[in-house]
Amino acid sequence: MLFSISFFDVVVNIISGIAMIIFIIASMIKSKNKILSWQCIGHMIFVFVETMTKAWSSIVQEVIGITRNLLTITKKNTKVISILLIILGAVIGVAVNIIFKPKDAPWFGSWVGYLPVVANLEYSIIVLRKNSTVRTIKLSFCISSILWGLNFLFLGVYVSAILNFICAITALISFFKFKNNMNIEEEEVKEN
């Protein structure tokens, strides 16, 4: 229930807070594979949290995210696999959102349940592109974090909602800092 606080809510918020700290760390890393590795750990923790909160559409997206990142890290993703993962995430996410509508959470099955689907869809497209850069991933991660933050707000996982919004800001700052560092390096190369 929105804005209810119980022992269960406290436990869920603590565990999700740990996962979000991992995602914040990932947003500050400059190596693509390290970003994706840290995110895999965060996704695994969130599968546990979302199982506890019965956020089935979110769980589908976490599993797709783990799969996507591992395939990207191990360089085993192909265009066919990439497209299949994107389609599976969207189709299964939408289906699960329609099928599972808990009575105690009337906003599920509505637009809120689609937030994780859209977040994962846009992020998957960016990460799986062969020419994606660290900057592009950071910006996509910012957008994804905003969508996940809204989702967690409605799940009652307030720590993750707040930290997702902080993570979005951190990724955006890192995005601009990384650009500025690239410009400085380019100027230094031109001067030499």
Descriptions of predicted regions:
Residues 1-192:
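Alpha-helical membrane-protein topology signature
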